Each structure stands twice: as C-alpha cells, then as structure tokens.
Amino acid sequence: MTVEQNVLQQSAAQKHQQTFLNQLREITGINDTQILQQALKDSNGNLELAVAFLTAKNAKTPQQEETTYYQTALPGNDRYISVGSQADTNVIDLTGDDKDDLQRAIALSLAESNRAFRETGITDEEQAISRVLEASIAENKACLKRTPTEVWRDSRNPYDRKRQDKAPVGLKNVGNTCWFSAVIQSLFNLLEFRRLVLNYKPPSNAQDLPRNQKEHRNLPFMRELRYLFALLVGTKRKYVDPSRAVEILKDAFKSNDSQQQDVSEFTHKLLDWLEDAFQMKAEEETDEEKPKNPMVELFYGRFLAVGVLEGKKFENTEMFGQYPLQVNGFKDLHECLEAAMIEGEIESLHSENSGKSGQEHWFTELPPVLTFELSRFEFNQALGRPEKIHNKLEFPQVLYLDRYMHRNREITRIKREEIKRLKDYLTVLQQRLERYLSYGSGPKRFPLVDVLQYALEFASSKPVCTSPVDDIDASSPPSGSIPSQTLPSTTEQQGALSSELPSTSPSSVAAISSRSVIHKPFTQSRIPPDLPMHPAPRHITEEELSVLESCLHRWRTEIENDTRDLQESISRIHRTIELMYSDKSMIQVPYRLHAVLVHEGQANAGHYWAYIFDHRESRWMKYNDIAVTKSSWEELVRDSFGGYRNASAYCLMYINDKAQFLIQEEFNKETGQPLVGIETLPPDLRDFVEEDNQRFEKELEEWDAQLAQKALQEKLLASQKLRESETSVTTAQAAGDPEYLEQPSRSDFSKHLKEETIQIITKASHEHEDKSPETVLQSAIKLEYARLVKLAQEDTPPETDYRLHHVVVYFIQNQAPKKIIEKTLLEQFGDRNLSFDERCHNIMKVAQAKLEMIKPEEVNLEEYEEWHQDYRKFRETTMYLIIGLENFQRESYIDSLLFLICAYQNNKELLSKGLYRGHDEELISHYRRECLLKLNEQAAELFESGEDREVNNGLIIMNEFIVPFLPLLLVDEMEEKDILAVEDMRNRWCSYLGQEMEPHLQEKLTDFLPKLLDCSMEIKSFHEPPKLPSYSTHELCERFARIMLSLSRTPADGR
C-alpha cells in the first residue's frame, strides 16, 4: 500500500457510488446529480428500486415531456432547447449570434461523449440495462409462459433423433433456451471442467446444511448438471433434453416481479453456484484455513489497480471472473483491452477536491480460462430503449497478454508512450496526405495530382471556334428540335400557366414564372457534331504552352513523389505499431480461442449459438441447439466479428495455451489408450446413461416393428390395387381408347406422338422398295433418331423446350448411353396403340420381337429404369413449375410457394446429375424467393392491422409457410440473394420490437420471434408435395410455352 487504509476505503466507496450514478444517468437519461443521489439514497443503494423510482416519477408528467419535445422540434416556437432535467439550469441559446454559447454547447457535448467513453468495463451497468429491458418486455408480454412443444417438436421417427457414431450431442431448445445451450456446450467442451462436474460428489453432510443453502438449489442443480453432462458424453441420442436443469435455473432467476435476467448474469450465476457447491466439498475434505476451490482456480484471476485518487496514489489487488469490455469505438480486442486497463479521470462527488484521479489495471494472475464479455448493448436515451451495437470487432485465434501483465508494466508503459508518439506523428502525416488527396478551398475537393493533370489537359486542348455559344446560336436547329420562333414567349407561358392553375398568391405566381423560363439545353436541343466536347484556351502561344506544360509536369511529378513518400511513411508506422509487441519477451503468455458465443437479433430478442474449437480434430464446430455441424474460421468470422447482418459475438472464451490439462483426455492406466464415451463416466452416471440408452433402443425396436407391420399392410393393399388396375387397363384397351394419361406411362405414347410415329413409318416405307416390316422399321428408327437429334441440337427460345416433346431429346441432351436410346425408340415403335393402324401393325410386331430379344447383359435394366424415372421427375418438375408460376401471377402466393418449393427441390436433385437434366435454377430460385417475400409482406400487414383474427392469420402464414422453408434458403451460402431475403424478412419483424403495441400482440410477437430467428440449417418436415393433375404432353408443352412467354414480357426489375 502507498497510502493509508482509510484513503483506499474512501476511494472504493466513492468509485462504487459514482458507478451507480453513471448507471442511473445512462439508463434514465436524467443528468441532475442531486436527483440521482436522492433516488439512490431513498432506495438504500438498490439500483433496480432507484430506476423504478425515477422512471415512475418521470411517467407522471407525460404531457410536459411531450410539450418539451415539440418545443425543441419546432423552430419557430422558442429559441431555447431543453435537455433532459437540465432544462432550467443548462439552457444554451444555439440560435443567437453568441459564439460563446455555441462553444459551450460543443464543450458539453464532448464532455458527455468523453464521460461515456471512460465508463467502460462495468458489469453492473450491463446488468442494470438488461433489467430495464426485461422489465419493459415483462410489462408487454404479461409474464409469458410457453410449453416446450411450442418451440420444438420431436420427430416421431426415432432414427431422426439417433446419434451418428461419436458425433457431438446437441441440446434441445425447451422454450427460448438457446442461451443455456450456448453457455453449457462451451463449458462442457472444456475437458477439465467436464471432469470436475462429472466426478463431483455432494458433501456427506448435505442434509445437515443450513436451510438457505438448499434454497439456493446448488446441490439439485449440480445433480442435474452431472446427469446432463453424462448424457452429452454417452447418449445414443442426437440431442438431449435439458429441461430439469433449466427449470431450476429459471426458478432461481425470477425476481419478485418475474423478470428473467440476461445471459451474462446467467453465466455469472452459474459459476457462482458451481463455486458454492465446490466450496462446500472443499471445506469438508480439507482442514486448511482457506481450502482451494477448483472453480475459482479455473475461472478467476487477479489484477492490481494502480492509480491516483484526488492527488493521492493507491494500489489495490482485486479478483475478477468474466472480464467486461466495451465494443463501441474500438476496432479489435486489443483496443478494447487497452481502454479497459487504462481508466481516465475519476469524477469526484466532492467538488472541493480538485486533484486529478485515474488508474491502471495490471494482471497479476490470469485464470486458465479467461472469458471476455463484449458489451454490445447501449441505452438510447432518445428512443427510451436499449439498442444493440452492430459495429465490427476483430479478435485473434491466439491472444498474447504479456503487455497487460504487472511484471511487464514498465516495458509496456514505454511501448505505450512510443505508440502514442507514433500515432501523433501518424495523425500529422495523414493530415498532410489529406491535403494532397483533397485539394481546394471550396466544398468540392479533388486530388492535387488530378487537378494538375486536368490543367495540363486543358492547356493542351485545341480550340475549334471563337465562341461555343455563338457557334450554337449560328447553327440551324437540328432535326427534331423546336424552332425558336415557335416557342411561346415568357409572357405567354406565364399566362397559360395562370389560366390552368387555381388562384394563387402573387409570390407563388412569381415563383412559377421564374421557374418557367429556365433553359434546359440538354433536353431542348442536341449539340452539333462539330462542337468540341472539352473546353480549350482561346489564346495561348507555343512558348507559353511549353513553359506551362513544363511546370505542370514538374509539379505533378513532385506531388506524386510527395504523396508516395507520405503513403510509405504511413504504412511503415502502421507496421511498426503492429509489431510493437511482437518481440519474444512479449509473446510468452499465449491464450487460444476456445469458444465464441454469438447473438443474432436486436436488443429485445434474438437467438444464441456457439462456435467451439474441437482440439482433437483441430477444427471449429457450430453448436446451434440440436444442430451440431462442422464449421470453419471463415464462417465464425462472418457471424462473430459484427458489422454484417445482425449477428455478432457477445462472449469470447480463451484458454491458456500452455495449460494442456484443460483439454487433455483421460487415459486407461493399464492399456495407455484414451478413454472415450461412457468409459469416462463414474459408475453411478454410467448406470444412468445405460438405462437411458436402453429406453432409446426399445423406442427404435418399437418403431421398426411398426414400420414392418405398415409395410406388410401396404404390400397387401398394393397387390390388390395392381389386380384392379390390370382389369381396368384390359377393359380400356378393349374399348379401343388410343389416348390415355401419360403420368404413369414410361413410353409417353400420346395422341400426337402416335401420329408422328405413323408419319415416320409412312415416310420410311415410301423411301424403300423393300416393304418388309424389318426394313421399314430400321429406316423409320433412323429417320426418327435423325429428327430428334436435330431437335436436341436446335437453339430455341425459353418458351420452347423439346425435351418436353420427346424423352429421347432429353436423353440425347444428357448423353444417355446408346443402348438406352435404342431400346426407348424400339418401345416407341412397339407400342400396342399402333396395332389399331393397319399400316403400322406389322412394324409394331417386329419392334416387340426385337424388344423381347434384348438380353439383360446388353441393356442394364436398373440404369434404363433410372433414366426414365429421371425423365418422369423432369416432367413433374416442369408441371410443378408451371402451376407455381401461374399461381404467382394470380397472386395466390401460398399455393404458388408449395409448388415452387417442390419444383426447386426436384430440379436441384436433377441438376446434380447433369447440366441439362432440369430447368434454370436461378429462375425457380428467384420466384421461390419472391413468393416468400410476398407472403412475409402479407403476414406483416395482417399483424399490423391489430385485429385478432387478422393477426392470427398472419402468424399462421409465418409459422406454416415462412419459418419451415427458411432453412431451404440458407442451405446454400453462395446464394447471397436468398440470405439477404431472409435477413429482410427477419428485420421486418424485429423492427416491431421498438414499437408500442397491445400487450397481447407483444406476447404473440415474443413467442414467434425465436422461431423466425432460429439459425438452424436443419430442414424440418413440412407439407406433403401437392398432387399434380393429369396432363398430356400437348397440354404440358402448351402451358409451359404460355407461362414462359408471359415471363419474358415481365420487366427485368419484376423478375
């Protein structure tokens, strides 16, 4: 200690009180210190009561506030502007001529900004803001309660919930609990923390503990956390249900008015509970005066506060857990840390003490697990609600903390002074460079090099005529322009205008007349072709031009050299600053990024997930509730740095890179092999997990039995239908009906195809003297194949697709095997419908005989069937697309969406096999996206109406048609338009959070938003594909041509 103990106590008390006052000032917007101190005194230091007291007091005078607002908004009302509660004391005249008032206003503004900037790294502030936010939500949603099934419904098929091999296990969202999943998964993947929890044993005297210990629910929570961790280790399920642990947390987190706390406070509370639970165990197992607590050893460190308070020096050692950092105003993590470690002047509550105050923080002991809270929320006093800060903040995978250690403080101070000196010099250089890059004295400025170049170009230009104005006047009016004598005079124009307009004031008539005579040269005439495009000097001698060019060239070269030198100097300084801490002595304390907790949304609502580094596989994993997927550093950066969309990191968890015990696996003492899965569990948890796995195995067996029984029933039903269909087909053929529906038919032998086949056979028989059926068949097949090849190679407009006309065209374009095409053509000429034509009967018999002679080894029947199945799917996809686009044009967006979704999915599957297997993917994607946007707009308008029936209809549209299909747009990250469309839809609904609405509407919105913001890529089950009507090839081609023609007539911005 460098001062007496009472000075330190006074410092701590004043700092604590000042912190509370700063929090109240920011939350409530009240700047009067006396009012704030009185509120804090009346509430006995309770921040929540103080906020409630102040907000209730302000709420009593809404009319006065409204009046004040309009007085400041209307320029003609008053010359004075009232600012918060200082309207009577700090009135500044900004409309008069007194420059002192203006300077005073600027000074006050800067002082307020600097004060807010200095108040960084205060966890209580975060919590207070969160409480105000939650109070607002609680008032609107009226203590909303939700059942787990409203958020997520388990698939009836247990195989959808089965864990794949040793894949990481997810956590089920049981009602806005994505925050729980993100935090717990981050801690679970710290192997040392996992071991501590799994091997925890409650104190033997747990029943004898004081009643308040049980009220805290530490031991029940530890029991449920052990069970949860055990399931995460050894379950056979894809995800597990954390409901029991969550319920204990929710009960403990509810205050008297049922407000639920924020995620940061949840993490604090979680570690506090764990610390208490392990403290009880530690005290039982040791007789030491201060037993070691493994939670404290793992997550808590110490720093030394060194500073000056009212002119007196002090040093004080403090313990810290999660380290809070402000984001606003900083570009990377080191800048945040620098600002948090160096505090500026501390405001004194006693005005008579004028000594300067300030302090530095130096880490003396860092925890193995170092967690940074990134404060991305601030209270907007103008709007009266918290707002999220979306600014970009970069952070490294390896963070070196040597510069913040107490043992390095002398060298760090030297380096900080050097960096400050370099930054000051950098500012001077940048200002010099700016003078070169933005040259001029007017509002428009240009690079000086360009100015000199333009001057050189002007001087070198050659004049064509003496006066461009005279030249234009002298030239005759070009074709299409109006001769001057035909234009009405100014008086005539004014008279015409006056006669057409209603009676107006003289000033408005004068304004109209002044505007009516404005000459518009670029719309009233065209420039003669011989007029020079650039101006040029009228008179300049060769000597003058030579001197001027020489000077301009020389000056331009000088400026280019100066600019280059400045840019190189600036780059060198930047590089020097970046490498300031890169020497070996300052990279001895490496911390590696272990987990990043991400929040997407606004201050009032959003979704949480986590990126966690898999140290065994050396890759990043994304934990998003039940979905656990492989990820990458690039994806993490895109979602976590901020500045893009609404997602950004709110918590960073670093681990000591030299503390390998944190991530080291356990090994079998006998075999030396690493223990995996259920082997790592204590006996009691092993029995618990095995019992749960047996229940799940039984569920799988019951499902298999149900499927087997269902398959048997379907098989019996199918055989019965087959017998009935064979009877009906025989009856239809006997009736001589040549045209039938082609959906189930592989040969697609419709009326128009039958006529084309007959024409080909007739043509082939006329070309050969040998009229034998086999000769005619061979000739006909050659002619038909040549015709189809020509169609396949023809360049057609979008409305004509010959693949729809004939299956062989589809095969040719997709390079099907020759044997597949030959057999398909034989089936065309061997179709039984040709038996009704005397000219083709014998040809059909020969074709059928050839088909029967084809051996299985000559044509792969499975491949043959697969090609025809793909063609059937192509026709179905076409029909889905046609109906979807027709409904879209009729503005029947729900029906359109269902068909377009099926079209897109089928088409994507086809295109994966070949470029010409399906339709234009971008076209289908565009209308699918537009359909979702239109439906979202309709639903939002229904919600805005406020009518219960309309609101419910709007939410039904969102829940039934928008939310289930959003993952389809997010699957392909390369489709930027789809991702932006999803962001637009989400932002539309998030924008309602800042609006006043009825409590029941706020409740519905709060219930619905987590589903909309769920970032899970897992595609949940949705509506069955709509049934297609029966259609002929002719109808299919005709409707396709009609809809594509209508699209081609749609303007580009409408497609």
Curated annotation (Swiss-Prot):
GO terms for biological process: negative regulation of ERAD pathway; negative regulation of interleukin-17-mediated signaling pathway; negative regulation of response to oxidative stress; protein deubiquitination; protein K48-linked deubiquitination; protein K63-linked deubiquitination; protein modification process; proteolysis. The active site is at C178, H599, H607. Residues 77-102 are annotated as: SUMO interaction domain (SIM). It catalyses: Thiol-dependent hydrolysis of ester, thioester, amide, peptide and isopeptide bonds formed by the C-terminal Gly of ubiquitin (a 76-residue protein attached to proteins as an intracellular targeting signal). The modification Phosphoserine is found at S85. It holds the Pfam family UBA_8. Residues 169-657 form the USP domain. One of its GO terms (molecular function) is ubiquitin protein ligase binding. Its EC number is 3.4.19.12. This is Ubiquitin carboxyl-terminal hydrolase 25. Residues 97-116, 123-140 form the UIM domain. Residues 14-57 form the UBA-like domain. There is a cross-link at K99 (Glycyl lysine isopeptide (Lys-Gly) (interchain with G-Cter in SUMO)). PROSITE patterns: UIM, USP_1, USP_2, USP_3. The gene is USP25. Residues 476-496 have a biased composition (Polar residues). Transmembrane segments: none annotated. Residues 497-507 have a biased composition (Low complexity). The lineage of its organism: Eukaryota, Metazoa, Chordata, Craniata, Vertebrata.
